Amino acid sequence: MKKIMLIASAMSALSLPFSASAIELGEEGGLECGPYGKVGIVGGMITGAESTRLDSTDSEGKKHLSLTTGLPFGGTLAAGMTIAPGFRAELGVMYLRNISAEVEVGKGKVDSKGEIKADSGGGTDTPIRKRFKLTPPQPTIMPISIADRDVGVDTDILAQAAAGQPQLTVEQRAADRIAWLKNYAGIDYMVPDPQNPNARVINPVLLNITQGPPNVQPRPRQNLDILDHGQWRHLVVGVTALSHANKPSVTPVKVLSDKITKIYSDIKPFADIAGIDVPDTGLPNSASVEQIQSKMQELNDVLEDLRDSFDGYMGNAFANQIQLNFVMPQQAQQQQGQGQQQQAQATAQEAVAAAAVRLLNGNDQIAQLYKDLVKLQRHAGVKKAMEKLAAQQEEDAKNQGEGDCKQQQGASEKSKEGKGKETEFDLSMIVGQVKLYADLFTTESFSIYAGVGAGLAHTYGKIDDKDIKGHTGMVASGALGVAINAAEGVYVDLEGSYMHSFSKIEEKYSINPLMASVGVRYNF
């Protein structure tokens, strides 16, 4: 009996090596198809992943820091069936680890005088004055929820004073409506008149917002009477629509976390002088309502401790106690009361995070603290304390590396280069795919095959040293390989493949691996 072995195997870039069953031609020319199983090992490199951190030296703020990626490796397990001569179908799973990357951070070495030294190219260190400008986080306008819109529509005005009493102005009567516009839409009701700097006019932005019944087209531009409830209702609806059209590309939790991180980064030099610990962790994207509330209370306590530490150090500074008084929105409390439904939790989370962002937007207490810190920064005693602290930190860094000469030398070189390494992500993946394969060229000793596949990839691990919620997304792959007939019914498959991910992990990274695999296949 004459045998011609037709082999096809392929693994997906993060998934499975592929194999084929034996096809046996008997004396009558009959075709015998059969199942097969395969195990293998894989390794490769990561493509498609870009750092989320921007290069601070890029004036346009568009250049990302470069990533140094690890070499992922793992194992595969697959089962398949020859469905026709030269065509095979396979189902397999693969586990892959060490999907990691580090990012280069730091562009210079800070000396004890608070200056950055850069290599001038001539072997000498050229001091560059470090810019340390204190400015509060810029306001971020968050999408207005349906509940917040309804609150805005129902915002009433004050009645006019009785006859004989001082008459109230339009701004006094509509104070609550004006405050709603500022807090929820970031729009000032009155602005300086460009034709007369000493006068103020209604913000032209409000006049350009669509008003009136939506079925009337076109709707002409009209003056705004903020005391008129009908006009006010249409204005609130228009502002709400604009807030969703121009909403940030990231979640409210991420916006809040970035604001708090920025504040902590700004106050840390002063907190170090006062001996106050500043937290270095932000909010995870999956932060619960309780975590958001706790983070806001933590921020309040840190800022108040800092203010209290310098109270009395300078005249007319750090005098007013900081009380952010963050209160969870009423609609979020109602949504939490609905139970543990995932949708209700997500809606409550977004509402609470958005409310926290609005509290920090242009917060007078935080703005005053920043002004006081600017005054403190110019104080001779504080300058000397900062220089002493920087020198001590530099000395501690040097002493820490004295235990190992090689490590010290490497640290010195890194210091000269002005670069360090921080972990960007460290992930693992489990991939399952269904694949189809076809033989391209076949002999008795080997065959060349190609394949395509699709399936799901589940990713978990750490990003920026923080555990992430498991992410599952669609993937597709292509493979090209060689199957070698090693023994009766035993084949060795050598394969290269590429896998494309259709979704991003944590809305940041698209992991598209380029892989090579070695597998042993046995035909039953």
UniProtKB/Swiss-Prot annotation:
Residues 1-22 form the signal peptide. The chain crosses the membrane at residues 67-87, 472-492. Keywords: Cell membrane, Membrane, Signal, Transmembrane, Transmembrane helix, Virulence. Residues 395-405, 413-422 have a biased composition (Basic and acidic residues). It is found in: Cell membrane. It is a multi-pass membrane protein. GO terms for cellular component: plasma membrane. The keyword Transmembrane helix applies. Its main location: membrane. It comes from the Bacteria. The keyword Translocase does not apply. Residues 112-132, 387-422 are annotated as: Disordered. May be an adherent factor for rickettsial adsorption to the host-cell surface and a determinant of virulence of individual rickettsial strain. It is the major outer membrane protein. NCBIfam families: Orientia_TSA56 (NF033390). This is 56 kDa type-specific antigen. It comes from Orientia tsutsugamushi.
